[in-house]
Curated annotation (Swiss-Prot):
This is Protein LURP-one-related 4. Might be related to the phospholipid scramblase and tubby-like superfamily of membrane tethered transcription factors. The lineage of its organism: Eukaryota, Viridiplantae, Streptophyta, Embryophyta, Tracheophyta. InterPro entries: LOR, LOR_sf, Tubby-like_C. Belongs to the LOR family.
Amino acid sequence: MARVFPQAAISSPYMSTERETFTVWMKSLVYQTNGLTVYNSNGEITYRVENYDKCSNEVHIMDLHGNILFTIRKKKLWLFGSWYVYRECGSFTSTEEVKPCARIKRSSIRDGDWEVRDETNEVFWILRFDPKFAFQIIDIHGNIIAQVKPKQSSNGITLGEDVLTLEVKPRVDHSLVVTLVTVYGLIKGIDGEVKQLRDFEEEEVAVGDEIAIEI
């Protein structure tokens, strides 16, 4: 059974024997649609997502020509849920028709981080950092598989929250890494909703206390 992140040299357009750097623009090329566009170091579009939305239960990762490489499906579990990743299964209507190649869920042992478990039961981690969209993907030994951080100009100026730099180590399937970046974007959307809910609850308590004092 294939690993999510194979380490052997493989002839694939989605892997390289060298470290690769991509620019991720958290926007769609299609007018007025949510999405994500990924450029390689030559400025060429390599991946795109046109139905990216924090409310989406299904998201497709495509190549430049619109061929579906991965499908992300969300399984709702209270506020957070978990995400299942399927290879080239955009035509499937039921998750029971094919097994996922990876599952992503909130870690039960690493607070604030997310667990990635592949079809061979190998575990990876998505480790978040202080900036809104900065994180690393590491293996069980702590080796960095890929990392994402805000993109900066040659003068060190951050280009914006929706423009990112993605670095992928050699012999890693960068199409799947882009898929995990997409999942993390969905996760950050959910986290934002949770924060808003907590802020609202705190405001409700504060208002209630104030009224009680006035009475």
